[in-house]
Design a protein with these regions (language model features):
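Rossmann-fold dehydrogenase core element
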Residues: 84, 99-118, 136-141
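Short glycine-rich anion-binding loops that position phosphate/pyrophosphate groups of nucleotides
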Residues: 68-69, 91-92, 116-117, 204
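Rossmann-fold NAD(P)-binding glycine/threonine-rich loop
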Residues: 75-76, 80, 89-111, 122, ...
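Hydrophobic beta-strand scaffold residues
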Residues: 29, 47, 85-86, 110-111
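Structural motif
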Residues: 7, 65-66, 88-89, 114, ...
Length: 261
């Protein structure tokens, strides 16, 4: 049975991860850590104040859903301590991923870092890769709850990168230039992501995590959309990563390879 620690355990995602781990018959919730929530209860455990509790609990795997700055500090601790890591925090840059790859290349521990653990969202990206070479234009709209700090989301950036890579691999030319010649309001056309894919962010109460990818071609459009209505939608992917990370040397980015797609 794998002993699992959860960092960021007092947040909404962290508490959901604790519940999922506690309910899994092959996993044991060994420790919950979250300094701002220290002393609170989650799944019958008292939330610990500091990362040192991870070693004391002899956790095999840690799931980190804290904030990006904390993850940057925590990853070297996991790598040096030989604790396998599953990270779902957004806001990590390509440079952060490169640093993590170096850390875990020289570690006895492995890591999985994913922008989105919802299996439907991963499938959306795969469907977008299939569509990208056959359509003339594309834009991405991501919609999240009003407490999300980063914009655009990691999932939307990853989607744009996947679309750009699929077009390049197929030998398709670049996306058409933005036809806008008069910007009445600054930012109205969103941000330019990888491969020139336009990214638009929406933040509203009542939302969880949603993404809509709109492809356009002469006389037609194709819309691919995924909606997470509940944080439980992420748990199958999180648990898959927890169970798989011990057998995935070094750093794995995304859960696509864990799903075999």
């Amino acid at each position: 049975m794998l002993r699992v620690g959860v960092v960021g355990a007092g947040g909404r995602m962290g508490r959901e991860v604790c519940r999922a781990v506690a309910e899994a018959p092959d996993l044991e919730l060994a420790v919950a850590i979250d300094p701002p929530h220290g002393g609170e209860d989650v799944e019958g455990l008292e939330i610990s104040w500091g990362i040192g509790a991870l070693g004391l609990a002899q956790a095999d795997v840690v799931v980190d859903f804290s904030v990006a700055d904390a993850v940057r500090d925590n990853l070297p601790i996991y790598a040096k301590g030989g604790v396998h890591a599953v990270v779902g925090t957004t806001g990590l840059s390509d440079a952060d991923l490169d640093a993590a790859a170096h850390l875990f290349a020289d570690s006895a521990a492995n890591a999985v870092i994913a922008a989105n653990f919802a299996i439907g969202a991963v499938l959306l990206m795969r469907f977008c890769e299939l569509a990208a070479p056959h359509m003339d234009g594309v834009e991405v709209i991501e919609l999240h709850h009003d407490a999300k700090r980063d914009a655009p989301s990691g999932t939307s950036r990853q989607t744009a990168a996947a679309i750009a890579a699929a077009r390049e691999q197929a030998g398709v030319g670049p996306l058409p230039a933005d036809p806008t010649t008069e910007m009445v309001l600054e930012g109205a056309r969103g941000a330019e992501g990888p491969g020139g894919v336009r990214l638009h962010s929406v933040r509203l109460p009542g939302l969880i995590a949603h993404e809509e990818v709109i492809f356009g071609a002469v006389g037609q459009s194709l819309t691919i959309r995924h909606d997470s209505y509940d944080r439980r939608s992420f748990m199958p992917g999180v648990l898959l990563a927890v169970r798989s990370v011990t057998e995935r040397p070094g750093l794995t980015v995304g859960i696509e390879s864990l799903l075999g797609i």
